[in-house]
């Protein structure tokens, strides 16, 4: 009977879970229109959790990009990129993830997050006028959307192709520009921005809405699922000097789609091995403790030790999936290309619903030769 009581006493330990750092509070503050609060949270996380540094730098990079601090955004995205592309070894920092919580390791992101890091590096460098680095960033976005841990897929993130081609055109590489534009057009044939006849000296990049939320499901939280936030404006107008120039277009930049597919095929990631062991060890440990009364002498002691060992191992082998994710990503990347006469123009980004983060209107100077890139973020 005493052994049965002991079995019941250790049951609460099975439910014990180690807390992990994440950026949930950052995302909530950001989408409520409180970027200063989001920035404060990120400062605290950067101080407290070195293992999540790449995640926090990416989140902060988005805030800096929207605030027009392109140099700061560049530094954050570059450092995050260096961490995310590093190959994990069996160091003491990584071994904890084998027997501990899945989130207790260095955050390097899912393939779609690595791809979006490359996308943002490209956007920032376009805005800074560093076109070779911009092209490299978009090339990275294409690469990480098409490969993962040795597996090869076909990149289907059309904006990355268009923007790599655009940066290549700025560098005088017409061959890459034509090839990338053709690939983007093949992916989204209905998007006017990808048609060869669409030309212009103004390119507008608009990140729209809220990106996917990563959650854990399953008996032990071992399954990863992504929750979509589909709310977005029905229309986003580009207005120049008080006159509508055109509408920003859906251009195959669905981030939820990128998160949940590989080469267009839906996938689910499950940490099955840990989950199976955890369930089996819990059941075997509790059963052994309950049956310990049936043994005598040394057998009874051995049964107790074995039962406790199994239960403790089930506690420390954590099956929970890592749900840390980049909360400030958009749900969609939209694009526009049009033509303005050389000189100064006031440009407004006007969504049918929602709001433009930080700045909805800005004055630009269109050169006699060359083009201008504008970036905006629209939130609901």
Specify the residue positions occupied by each region the protein language model found.
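"A position-specific structural signal for the A-helix of alpha-solenoid helical repeats
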Residues: 24, 59, 63-66, 113-120, ...
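Flexible helix-coil transition and linker loops at the boundaries of alpha-helical arrays
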Residues: 44-51, 84-109, 145-154, 191-194
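Short loop/turn and low-complexity linker motifs enriched in small/turn-promoting residues
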Residues: 178, 186, 198-380
């Amino acid at each position: 009977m005493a052994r049965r009581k002991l079995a019941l006493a250790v049951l609460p330990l099975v439910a014990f879970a180690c807390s992990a750092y994440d950026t949930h509070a950052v995302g909530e503050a950001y989408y409520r229109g409180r970027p200063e609060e989001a920035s404060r949270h990120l400062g605290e996380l950067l101080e407290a959790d070195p293992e999540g540094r790449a995640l926090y730098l990416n989140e902060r990079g988005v805030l800096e990009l929207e605030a027009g601090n392109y140099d700061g955004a560049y530094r954050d995205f570059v450092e995050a990129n260096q961490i995310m592309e590093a190959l994990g070894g069996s160091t003491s920092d990584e071994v904890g993830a084998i027997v501990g919580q899945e989130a207790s390791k260095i955050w390097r992101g899912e393939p779609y997050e690595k791809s979006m890091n490359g996308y943002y590096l490209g956007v920032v460098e376009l805005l800074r006028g560093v076109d070779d680095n911009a092209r490299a960033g978009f090339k990275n976005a294409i690469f990480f959307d098409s490969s993962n841990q040795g597996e090869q897929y076909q990149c289907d993130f059309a904006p990355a192709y268009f923007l790599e081609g655009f940066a290549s055109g700025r560098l005088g590489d017409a061959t890459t520009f034509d090839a990338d534009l053709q690939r983007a057009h093949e992916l989204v044939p209905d998007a006017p921005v990808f048609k060869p006849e669409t030309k212009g000296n103004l390119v507008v990049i608009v990140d729209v809405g809220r990106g996917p939320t990563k959650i854990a499901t399953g008996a032990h939280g071992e399954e990863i699922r992504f929750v979509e936030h589909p709310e977005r404006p029905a229309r986003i107008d580009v207005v120049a000097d008080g006159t509508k120039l055109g509408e920003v277009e859906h251009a195959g930049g669905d981030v939820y789609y990128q998160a949940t597919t590989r080469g267009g095929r839906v996938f689910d990631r499950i940490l099955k091995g840990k989950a199976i062991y955890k369930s089996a060890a819990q059941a075997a440990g509790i059963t052994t403790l309950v049956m310990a009364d049936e043994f005598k002498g040394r057998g009874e002691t051995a049964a107790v030790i074995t039962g406790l060992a199994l239960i403790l191992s089930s506690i420390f082998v954590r099956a929970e999936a890592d749900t840390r994710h980049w909360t400030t990503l958009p749900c969609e990347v939209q694009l526009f290309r049009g033509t303005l006469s050389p000189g100064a123009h006031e440009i407004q980004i006007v969504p049918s619903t929602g709001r433009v983060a930080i700045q909805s209107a800005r004055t630009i100077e269109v050169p006699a030769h060359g083009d201008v890139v504008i970036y905006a973020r629209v939130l609901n």
